[in-house]
Amino acid sequence: MLASLFPLARPVLHALDAETAHRLTIRALSLLPAGAPPADDPRLAVSVLGRHFPNPVGLAAGFDKGAEVPDALLSLGFGFVEVGGVVPRPQPGNPRPRVFRLTGDRAVINRFGLNSEGLAVVAARLAARAGRPGILGVNIGANKDATDRLADYVACTRALAGLVDFVTVNVSSPNTPGLRDLQGEVFLDDLLARVVAARDEAASPRRAAILLKIAPDITLDSLDAITATALRRGVEGLVISNTTVARPASLTETTLAAEAGGLSGRPLFAPSTRLLAEAFLRVGDRLPLVGVGGVDSAEAAWTKIRAGASLVQLYSALVYAGPGLVREIKAGLVERIAREGVPLAALVGRDAAALARME
């Protein structure tokens, strides 16, 4: 239903500022009955992270920050949904305006600053949907004014790990000062050790997988250290990548491109895919990868998979293409799987060496 309405709603939504339009979308989703998602072609199924995903196409964190409408989003056909980011105490984030559409570039810049209703509110919403079907994850961070950021991640993990299928440790948001410093080897080692321990202490049979979300703007030496630390500390997967602080010369919306914040959408595709491929070359099948950044078509999702992604996520593309994009991507993946004549899992990372050098 939403997919058919989007062409009519898009001019209205895009006439509004981006954040207001997004709140209206969340409101609309909350009013619609969350029906069962459409049945997926079995060739799209993925078994990873200790779960059986009906398809590999997920919704990235940031769309449903407060876990208000996860079931409505799953009903759109996503194989999984990641809510958040969540921080322990409510915080307003950065002043508005803080999100900008670069329409000519099919991109978005945001500097939300991890605005969140706080851990208690999100945990209550997730607890209220216990027992419902669908694979759900949560993205966690630290309060901007936290005196002990590691403790913030531990608190979020303890409260949420028994309510979701995976917890994504976000140390890569460019909009919280100093947060990306936690990607440094010493900090990261301590952080992951404590988060994994907190997950293991959670008295829940669900045992959420722990994922780590990293920035696209790191060096290969940093990637070496991050992947080694993740493997050593028992992290179950990497999410590659968050938004970029870089501004490619190809951007046409030059005035908006000067806005501070993280850039997502189509311009992020190449750098995030290169990093994804480099990560796969380092970890192989020892650590599942989630490919994020510029996934706006079946071909883009297919490329992420060949670069090493077992799962993919999208968000910014929905701003321009609407929810019907999910169905289009899945149909395109089925066509490509049929053409190749091999299971989807056999295609993961097949072209990583070449895609690590993509322009």
UniProtKB/Swiss-Prot annotation:
Binding residue positions for substrate: K65, N110, R111, F112, G113, L114, N170, N175, N242, T243
Residues where FMN binds: A61, G62, F63, D64, K65, G85, N139, N170, K213, S241, G265, G294, Y315, S316
Keywords, comma-separated and alphabetical: Cell membrane, Flavoprotein, FMN, Membrane, Oxidoreductase, Pyrimidine biosynthesis
Details of cofactor binding: Binds 1 FMN per subunit.
Cofactor(s) required for function per UniProt: FMN
UniProt subcellular location: Cell membrane
PANTHER family associated with the record: DIHYDROOROTATE DEHYDROGENASE (QUINONE), MITOCHONDRIAL, DIHYDROOROTATE DEHYDROGENASE (QUINONE), MITOCHONDRIAL-RELATED
HAMAP family: DHO_dh_type2
Assembly with partners or alone: Monomer.
Protein name as it appears in the record: Dihydroorotate dehydrogenase (quinone)
Protein's organism: Methylobacterium nodulans (strain LMG 21967 / CNCM I-2342 / ORS 2060)
